[in-house]
Amino acid sequence: MRWCWIDRFTELVSGQTASAIKVVSMADEHLHDHFPAIPVMPNSLILEGMAQTSGLLISEYNDFRERVILAKVTKVTFHDRAVPGDTLTYRAKLEAIEPDGARATTTSHIGNRLQAEAEILFAHIDRETADRPLFHANDFGLLLRGLKIFDVGRKADGSKIQCPPHLLEN
């Protein structure tokens, strides 16, 4: 992912749910361009953070071997804006997974307050070119470790999720 709109995962249960956070800071350059003189996190970037949380939950289900991309946002509602000092908590729930894609519901909260909610469809893309990854395996593995997925991630039985060997390659 060239642009990562989450700071770290706080929970992941394989094939079920995930939670991640994004701290909104005055240091974020994109806040100053969206509405001049009113620093606010653009809703499109909040939606992208929600999608990244959901997409990585879906990708983990198959040991990060599927090429998962956002296909369609079927519903999204924003209830409030996010401003510097807010911590967004993204919560994703895997609703369905099929060979060609998946569906997830996701929310964004500021504290206990619902900030946004969405239903998102994802696609597993072109199996014919699966030999060409979206990301270099080692770089993607480093990103996932930086997001703390393997620190907090658990299988449904409670055992710890391990970084797959194919993401440790040089």
Cite the ranges covered by each PLM segment.
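Hydrophobic residues on conserved beta-strands that form the core of alpha/beta folds
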Residues: 6, 70-73, 117
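A residue-level signal for conserved active-site and pocket-lining positions in enzyme catalytic cores
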Residues: 9, 50, 112
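Catalytic strand-loop segment that frames the active site of acyl-thioester-processing enzymes
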Residues: 1-41, 161-170
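Compact, glycine-rich, soluble single-domain proteins
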Residues: 35-42, 47-55, 70
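HotDog/MaoC-like acyl-thioester-processing domains
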Residues: 14-17, 83-84, 95-170
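Hydrophobic beta-strand-centered segment that forms part of the acyl-chain substrate-binding groove
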Residues: 54-89, 123-125
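Hydrophobic core residues within well-ordered beta-strands of beta-rich domains
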Residues: 3-5, 88, 102
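Conserved positions in beta-strands of structured domains
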Residues: 7-10, 74, 79, 93-95
